[in-house]
A protein has these predicted regions:
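C-terminal and inter-domain tail/linker signature
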Residues: 1-103
Length: 103
């Protein structure tokens, strides 16, 4: 599926909303058998949630890098009073579900 910039931004808001909501909401964004990696290592949707904690993650922006959409997710660390903007590179199937995610 090919996204426009506006669609990518809207999906980014949905993505971070699901990330902050819970395991089931986030997992529902993925196609069966989706490839997921975190910091280059094989993972799963829960692994992504582990490194982008619910309640401390926000949508920062989207950009198109065909065939990928790159979302920037901001992770807030209140203990160190810092923020970290992390790219999440996604590929989608024809129905708009994530088939590949590199976080």
């Amino acid at each position: 599926m090919s996204f426009s910039y506006d669609q990518a931004r809207q999906f980014g808001k949905t993505y971070v909303g699901a990330l902050n909501t819970g395991t089931e909401a986030f997992a529902a964004l993925f196609a069966p058998g989706a490839e997921v990696s975190v910091a280059g290592d094989p993972s799963d949707p829960q692994g992504v949630r582990d490194v982008t904690p619910a309640g401390r993650s926000g949508f920062r922006g989207a950009r198109l890098d065909p065939p990928h959409v790159v979302l920037t997710v901001r992770v807030i660390d209140p203990a160190s009073q810092s923020v970290d903007d992390r790219p999440h590179r996604l590929t989608f199937d024809a129905s708009g579900r994530i088939t590949r995610l590199e976080a």
